[in-house]
From Swiss-Prot:
Gene3D superfamilies cross-referenced by the UniProt entry: 3.30.1320.10
InterPro entries hit by this protein: Ribosomal_bS16, Ribosomal_bS16_CS, Ribosomal_bS16_dom_sf
One GO CC term on file: small ribosomal subunit
Similarity comment text for this entry: Belongs to the bacterial ribosomal protein bS16 family.
Recorded GO MF terms: structural constituent of ribosome
Source organism superkingdom: Bacteria
Pfam families: Ribosomal_S16
The protein, known as: Small ribosomal subunit protein bS16
Any GO BP: translation
Keyword field: Ribonucleoprotein, Ribosomal protein
Keyword field contains Translocase: no
Entry keyword Ligase: no
PANTHER family registered for this protein in UniProt: 30S RIBOSOMAL PROTEIN S16, SMALL RIBOSOMAL SUBUNIT PROTEIN BS16M
Length: 111
């Protein structure tokens, strides 16, 4: 069973709130999950300490068992001071290189 560390959306319309969960990779985004390991509230100021709350010990455990974080969650994990496995870091770098950057509307009008 492939396991992911990802965000599950909650909250009301136009007021998002996310749980950082450990879930089966094939499960729906907001569906069943194995464990809740944190929260993310994008409505709070970026310097607020409660914007991202993570259980570091449980995340380290799941990373050790082979769970793969999504790109956004991997950024949260790195900011929290948890080291990601080399394999996960390498995959993130490859994805970043392959990502196509579209020019903004201003850049396309100027050309």
């Amino acid at each position: 069973m492939a396991v992911k560390i990802r965000l599950a959306r909650g909250g009301a319309k136009k007021r998002p709130f996310y749980r950082v969960v450990i879930a089966n990779a094939t499960a729906p985004r907001d569906g069943d999950f194995l464990e809740k390991v944190g929260t993310y509230n994008p409505m709070l100021a970026s310097d607020n300490s409660e914007r991202v709350i993570l259980k570091k010990d449980r995340i380290e455990y799941w990373l050790g068992t082979g769970a793969k974080p999504t790109e956004r969650v991997a950024k949260f994990i790195e900011k929290a001071g948890v080291t990601l496995p080399k394999k996960v870091k390498k995959e993130m770098e490859v994805k970043a290189k392959n990502r196509k950057v579209r020019p903004s509307k201003k850049q396309s009008k100027e050309s």
